[in-house]
Amino acid sequence: MSIGILGTKLGMTQIFDNKTGVAIPVTVVQAGPCPVTQVKTKKTDGYESIQVGYKTVKEKALNKPLLGHLAKAGVSPLRHLIEYRLEDASAYTLGQEITADIFQEGDLVDVAGTTIGRGFSGYQKRHNFKRGNMTHGSKNHRLPGSTGAGTTPGRVFPGKRMAGQYGSTQVTIRKLSVVKIDSERNLILIKGAVPGKPGTLLNITPAKKFGK
């Protein structure tokens, strides 16, 4: 139960370690600022949490109930809202901005986002199935093979790997290292790759799992 931040993936680049000179591949994320739009307490809601928003939009992009909710917090219209549960939310106030400063260099974070959508894909591309022979009279090139038994059970079991929508799913990459923080521009440089293409919405939170 700890606070995170919403951000946008800008792309990938590399930076060099000052001591070893080794190139480090990093993803640049525009993190926040995320104003607090609601503070929940045990007295009013039964649990402690804060709700934050991200990405300013025009008023016509939101409905009236949401505009009224944001007006109570005294913030401009925001596209995305997310809630973080806390043990004690008393330290936060409406309108307070959450910035990239909540993380430090060397921190481990979990990054959640939507992967790149690749449309309807076949067995080899989606599940890495082995294809059949391309010559020697083979008529099985990219077919899936057997999908189950015959009359009994007389159906294909749920979960069978088949062709279908590939990508465009919610994925969390865990225990990525924060390489650098740019407080002035609210940028976070994260070692390695994160889900999605440039422009993807990301949810960055402190790592929940530790160890190998």
Swiss-Prot record:
One of its GO terms (molecular function) is rRNA binding. Keywords: Ribonucleoprotein, Ribosomal protein, RNA-binding, rRNA-binding. Residues 131-155 are annotated as: Disordered. InterPro entries: Ribosomal_uL3, Ribosomal_uL3_bac/org-type, Ribosomal_uL3_CS, Transl_B-barrel_sf. One of its GO terms (biological process) is translation. It holds the Pfam family Ribosomal_L3. The keyword Cell cycle does not apply. Coiled coil: none annotated. Transmembrane segments: none annotated. GO terms for cellular component: cytosolic large ribosomal subunit. SUPFAM superfamilies: Translation proteins. It comes from the Bacteria. One of the primary rRNA binding proteins, it binds directly near the 3'-end of the 23S rRNA, where it nucleates assembly of the 50S subunit. PANTHER family: 50S RIBOSOMAL PROTEIN L3, LARGE RIBOSOMAL SUBUNIT PROTEIN UL3C. Belongs to the universal ribosomal protein uL3 family. Part of the 50S ribosomal subunit. Forms a cluster with proteins L14 and L19. This is Large ribosomal subunit protein uL3. It comes from Microcystis aeruginosa (strain NIES-843 / IAM M-2473). The lineage of its organism: Bacteria, Bacillati, Cyanobacteriota, Cyanophyceae, Oscillatoriophycideae. The gene is rplC.
